[in-house]
A protein has these predicted regions:
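Mid-to-C-terminal functional-domain signal that highlights helix-capping/loop sites
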Residues: 1-236
Length: 236
């Protein structure tokens, strides 16, 4: 939340772990493109309320939500998404007791448990610095689970719809919701936020189940960047 981008190497693979609080978009990308490893930083700019990144090698600008270069020498290039999960620390610790957690060099420099966006994700809130059209039939700040179900085809499910059913199956995808994760954008402290639950999206393939990339973002974000995407609405 405070730094928005972490350049790291995990399992020998250079990755960029990114988060845009204004869109609640948490995405992980491979940093290798055309044989070159890119290092990413924040431009300080927004487009449709979403973080615009840049790479230090070519100074091209990248849209965080889509992973596409929108300005510069790499215009039109796309970063490959890495499957990841936005989940509570408790769930992570239970799944990986020996898992490693990134901490700053000086943890006391900033209160990382504080939320500078108090009540930003309330259903009736207005997206910050957004000038686009809102989707119909759903509040713009409703959380949705966005997935590229097939190459170039995007769908999203209203989180309330998934929470009500607990599981949604579509094609070879299985989308699940379980309670136990605090919203980072609700209360003054991250741990004090209301429960928005944990989401997983997996694909059944050849008798195996594999995680696939997804994002739990706001409805206005999905509509802005995937205007032709299908949005499944449930009860508000």
């Amino acid at each position: 939340m405070w730094h928005e981008i972490v350049n790291d190497t995990v399992g020998g693979k250079p990755v960029a772990v990114t988060y845009c609080p204004l869109c609640n978009a948490a995405l992980v990308f491979e940093r290798t493109l055309g044989g070159q490893v890119l290092d990413f930083g924040t431009t300080g700019k927004l487009r449709n309320s979403d973080l615009v990144m840049y790479d230090r090698q070519t100074e091209s600008w990248w849209q965080q939500f889509t992973g596409e270069a929108i300005v510069g020498a790499l215009l039109g290039s796309e970063l490959k998404l890495v499957p990841s999960r936005l989940e509570s620390f408790e769930r992570f610790r239970n799944r990986f007791p020996e898992g490693r957690v990134l901490v700053p060099n000086d943890p006391g420099k900033r209160n990382y448990g504080a939320n500078p966006y108090v009540r930003y994700d309330e259903i009736g809130s207005v997206p910050f610095l957004f000038r686009g059209d809102f989707p119909e039939g759903i509040q713009p700040m409703e959380r949705v689970v966005a997935v590229e179900v097939e190459p170039g085809r995007f769908e999203a499910w209203q989180l309330g719809l998934l929470r009500e059913s607990g599981e949604i199956r579509t094609g070879d995808l299985v989308i699940r919701w379980e309670a136990g994760q605090a919203s980072a954008l609700d209360a003054a402290t991250v741990g004090g936020g209301r429960d928005v639950g944990n989401v997983t999206v997996q694909r059944r393939a050849g008798g195996r189940v594999e995680d696939v990339p997804y994002d739990v973002t706001f409805a206005f974000v999905f509509h802005a960047f995937r205007p032709n995407g299908k949005l499944h609405r449930g009860k508000l």
